[in-house]
């Protein structure tokens, strides 16, 4: 497996231009006095958290919010070690992560913030328009390694074209979800190109005529001029395109999924973290839509806000993803009527 490491991306507010005229030391002192909120994890959730951080910092110039990208798994590792305040996650916390947090005394508040359509993409020149979950397994599955190397091996009507496979790395929540929903937890082939950075996957597929990959819908929306999204055949046998509408109506299964932030109970005691998380939940609906996600119903954000303010810790998912679930299924899992 070729694994490409992402550069760490961060959202931050620059010091006011007027301050640049002052000497270096006052600038450093002013910066040091700013309160800090730290988040890390999913590249899929990054656009939402980045958008929220930017808007929050416009209104709270005394608070600096950093948003890193290390994949959902990487974010949970840092979170359970007490290194960050918030973990961005494109899947629920796993049982082993629950245990890792427990061992370090890290209690957490689980907050769903939006729904995503995991999107399968190919090169713009590829004539394939739709694909089944079985065909996806035949392309990405462990058994395909060094065997399925041409599109025509997947289906006789597919083009005679070398197959090049791109996928998120194993620290990615998007990888975990795809592995569970499509590959029955058997893992991906070892001869693909993997990266936690979705932009690297975009570049790979857009430059490779036989390329195929998958990532969150927002990255497809941002790069749809370079890529082609495939319709995925759902449980009713209908080929359905990834879209906000098809997530809302529940037809884009099994690749529609909720995304989350997890807030450390200890961090939530800090006024700057409380202020940021409250702002996040108040604005996630509007901002998630702007960056290509499907907002949750208003009652879901109200319930999440109540959960946060009442300090209700733990997970309702028992270490499992909501595979093939709709927004209504998420609300039921969260106990929201």
Curated annotation (Swiss-Prot):
It comes from Synechococcus elongatus (strain ATCC 33912 / PCC 7942 / FACHB-805) (Anacystis nidulans R2). This is Protein SphX. The N-terminus is blocked. The keyword Secreted does not apply. GO terms for molecular function: phosphate ion binding. The lineage of its organism: Bacteria, Bacillati, Cyanobacteriota, Cyanophyceae, Synechococcales. Belongs to the PstS family. Pfam families: PBP_like_2. Gene3D superfamilies: Periplasmic binding protein-like II (3.40.190.10). Keywords: Cell inner membrane, Cell membrane, Membrane, Signal, Transport.
């Amino acid at each position: 497996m070729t694994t490409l490491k992402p550069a760490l991306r961060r959202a931050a507010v620059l010091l006011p231009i007027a301050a640049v005229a002052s000497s270096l030391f006052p600038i450093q002192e002013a910066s040091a006095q700013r309160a800090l909120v730290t988040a890390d994890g999913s590249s899929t959730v990054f656009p939402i958290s980045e958008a929220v951080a930017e808007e929050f910092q416009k209104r709270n110039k005394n608070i600096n919010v950093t948003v890193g990208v290390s994949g959902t798994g990487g974010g949970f590792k840092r979170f359970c070690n007490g290194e960050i305040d918030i973990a961005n996650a494109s899947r629920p916390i796993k049982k082993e992560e629950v245990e890792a947090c427990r061992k370090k005394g890290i209690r957490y508040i689980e907050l769903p913030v939006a729904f995503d359509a995991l999107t399968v993409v190919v090169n713009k020149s590829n004539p394939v328009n739709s694909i089944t979950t079985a065909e996806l397994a035949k392309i990405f599955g462990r058994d395909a390694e060094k065997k399925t190397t041409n599109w025509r091996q997947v289906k006789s009507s597919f083009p005679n074209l070398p197959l090049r496979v791109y996928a998120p790395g194993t620290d990615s929540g998007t990888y975990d979800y795809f592995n569970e929903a499509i590959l029955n937890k058997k893992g991906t082939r070892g001869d693909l190109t993997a990266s936690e950075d979705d932009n690297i996957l975009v570049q790979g597929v857009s430059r490779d005529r036989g390329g195929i990959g998958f990532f969150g819908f927002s990255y497809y929306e941002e790069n749809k001029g370079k890529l082609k999204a495939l319709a995925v055949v759902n449980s009713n046998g209908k080929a359905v395109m990834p879209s906000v509408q098809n997530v809302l109506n529940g037809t884009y299964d099994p690749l529609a999924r909720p995304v989350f932030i997890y807030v450390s109970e200890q961090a939530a005691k800090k006024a700057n973290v409380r202020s940021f998380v409250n702002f996040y939940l108040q604005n996630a609906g509007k901002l998630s839509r702007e960056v290509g996600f499907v907002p949750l119903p208003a009652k879901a954000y109200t319930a999440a806000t109540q959960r946060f303010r009442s300090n209700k810790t733990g997970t309702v998912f028992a270490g499992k993803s909501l595979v093939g679930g709709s927004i209504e299924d998420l609300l039921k899992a969260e106990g929201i009527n």
